[in-house]
């Protein structure tokens, strides 16, 4: 390798790097980029001292694009001789000038410098002295184009970097030089170990950016794979912020939850808990410049966000079990439950092979710590109340943890979503409970946590959330009423207290369904002729349940009963008429529509008989 540049060039270059690392908040308030501009001036001086680019290197053409930087553009060769060494050093300077301009929000100028860097390096891109810088320049161009929302261009640069890394490791394999080494004397060059660490970090960044690009392109399977690989590599190379790593792992768990891959989701969440526990305990490094624990609000927010991911895990696993075991009216099907019990052994037998295929985080003590968390949490669908209760209690623990940060004062929407998840945990647990009185108590708990929210919320600002809560409270009262009716049916002679309770629950359900339906009216209190797609199904369900509730009111007054039947018929008729004029609505409520048609046919006859009976008395 040629001799290192003279001391003046080396000193100016090192001074430029030092200024580049100065954090923006340490600059004067009116000159936030003062250190960046200082670094830029020094880099331009270094470029002038190095002299012009070698004559055999052409300037990049105006239409140079990411495809021109792909691996197929000319055969790479070793960077030997003074001309090649000067080209390499100029490329390093161009790279830092590019990053500098991007940092000061001058994206076009930054792009020009980075493209020039690639142009200088292209003949040597696979050599020991160039490959790391070439990948870094392409990574930065990938980020730049991503910020411009030119995702395909970003993807091309980043995939080119990934391919170059793979080709280099396959054909050469030895740790390449870090770009800064081109400005260091021989005795200050990095060790092989440090070179390897830095190069692997560059590749990890490449995978991280690719994960984001694939996510943006809605290639979710690929995005999850790259995110998982990034997180794994960060642990292997001990290059991560505990708080950031944990939130990324918890976020990845949501992908696996949606895919119903509960073992993988549990692994991500368990790892998130363990790594989050390191926050503030790891000494500051280049990768973690400040102790994250020094930011208490961010710490508690991230803790709350991870807790919410755990809630979703527990809730989705329980709901998936319910879907697998319920009959056509939403009750526990004992035959399906028995079938799933028989499958349990097979699921347990498959666990080991699934675990071997999955990407595991950590080794040694870290792996043991993650496994210790995993072992306390089930990943198989609960098949009875005791198993479901285990998940419910875990979910409820994380509800309390999430609510510590996401309070109604300051985090209205987040707080309400956590409360709704808490309510949903009670609702799905009630499915596994055989005792109807205990099920009633679970719905009562739901109502107790949801009703206060209706007082705190201004529907003018939180209309959508208000509707969701009104509908959910109405449904909870509706379910309680059905349970009380079922309890009364088992009694030979229900007393007046039970009748009064049924009517009270009926009245409360009607109140909240009506509040929901009234929220759909226009400022003149007129119900819409066309119901929006986003509220069509809930609106039709509310109408159907209101019709059914009026038919369930228990009264000794014949006149009142006739009025209730007429109101019930009116709501059933609304559903039938609306679906006739809006065929798309029929697809949303097929079962309810058939029942409504039946009731529209039967109720008038029932009402006529009732009137005839009244006339005789």
Curated annotation (Swiss-Prot):
Domain of life: Eukaryota
Tissue: In the embryo it is expressed in cortical neurons; expression increases during neuronal development.
UniProt keyword annotation of tRNA processing present: no
Region of interest called Disordered, as start-end residue ranges on this chain: 48-83
Biased composition (Acidic residues): 54-66
Keywords, in A-Z order: Cytoplasm, Cytoskeleton, Developmental protein, Differentiation, Neurogenesis, Phosphoprotein
Family, per entry: Belongs to the KIF-binding protein family.
Main location: cytoplasm
Intrachain disulfide bonds: none
GO terms, molecular function: kinesin binding; protein sequestering activity
Keyword Cytoplasm assigned: yes
Modification type Phosphoserine: residues: 174
Annotated compartments: Cytoplasm, Cytoskeleton
Origin species: Mus musculus (Mouse)
Official protein name in the record: KIF-binding protein
Assembly behavior: Interacts with KIF1B; positively regulates KIF1B microtubule motor activity. Interacts with STMN2.
Free-text function comment from the UniProt entry: Activator of KIF1B plus-end-directed microtubule motor activity. Required for organization of axonal microtubules, and axonal outgrowth and maintenance during peripheral and central nervous system development.
Organismal lineage: Eukaryota, Metazoa, Chordata, Craniata, Vertebrata
GO CC term (a single one): cytoskeleton
GO term, biological process aspect, one: cell differentiation
Pfam families linked to this entry: KBP_C
